[in-house]
Structure formats: C-alpha cells, structure tokens
C-alpha cells in the first residue's frame, strides 16, 4: 500500500521519522539516567549509603593498593655478580 503522491512531502522512505524516533529514544534514556543518578544521590544522603558501603570498599581498595605496591629499584642496594 502506498500513500498518494499529494500527501508525500519528501520521499525519504521514513528516514526523517526514524531519526526523530531515535532522538526521542536518546533523550528518554538520558533523562532516565539523570533520574537514576539523582535517586542514587538521594539514597546516599538519606540512607547513609556512603558510610555503610562506600567507606568499607575504600578501605579494602586502600589495603589492596598497599599490598600491591612494589618498592622502587635502588641503585646502591643492587648486588652485582
């Protein structure tokens, strides 16, 4: 089924409508992401998420960094054979 030629403004096979729908989808995803970030911030403020989750994770990461630290090469302490 084709539309009458009188109703066709631009014969682009739906490209313009497809682009408009993609932009709407991108805008909706961006707004959803912003809302999700604001909900996470609200949980951090109201539920003390920062103290119960983030601080222990930071301590564990600091312990991992200290464990994985490699001492620098010392020229004077090198043993030449």
UniProtKB/Swiss-Prot annotation:
A cellular component annotation (GO) from this entry: membrane
Topology versus the membrane: Single-pass type III membrane protein
Subcellular location field: Host Golgi apparatus membrane
UniProt keyword annotations, A-Z: Apoptosis, Host Golgi apparatus, Host membrane, Membrane, Transmembrane, Transmembrane helix
Membrane-crossing residue ranges in chain numbering: 20-40
Main location: host cell
Pfam hit, one: CoV_E
GO biological process terms held by the UniProt record: disruption of cellular anatomical structure in another organism; viral budding from Golgi membrane
Residue ranges annotated as Intravirion topological domain: 41-81
InterPro entries xrefs: E_protein_aCoV (IPR043507), E_protein_CoV (IPR003873)
Presence of the UniProt keyword Transmembrane in the record: yes
Residue ranges, Virion surface side: 1-19
Function: Plays a central role in virus morphogenesis and assembly. Acts as a viroporin and self-assembles in host membranes forming pentameric protein-lipid pores that allow ion transport. Also plays a role in the induction of apoptosis.
Family: Belongs to the alphacoronaviruses E protein family.
Assembly and interaction partners: Homopentamer. Interacts with membrane protein M in the budding compartment of the host cell, which is located between endoplasmic reticulum and the Golgi complex. Interacts with Nucleoprotein.
Protein name: Envelope small membrane protein
Species assigned in the record: Porcine transmissible gastroenteritis coronavirus (strain FS772/70)
């Amino acid at each position: 089924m084709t539309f009458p030629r009188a109703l066709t403004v631009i014969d682009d096979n739906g490209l313009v409508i497809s682009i408009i729908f993609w932009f709407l989808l991108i805008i909706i995803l961006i707004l959803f992401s912003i809302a999700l970030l604001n909900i996470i911030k609200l949980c951090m403020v109201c539920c003390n998420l920062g103290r119960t989750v983030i601080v222990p994770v930071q301590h564990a990461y600091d312990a991992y960094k200290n464990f994985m630290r490699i001492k620098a090469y010392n020229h004077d302490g090198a043993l030449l054979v």
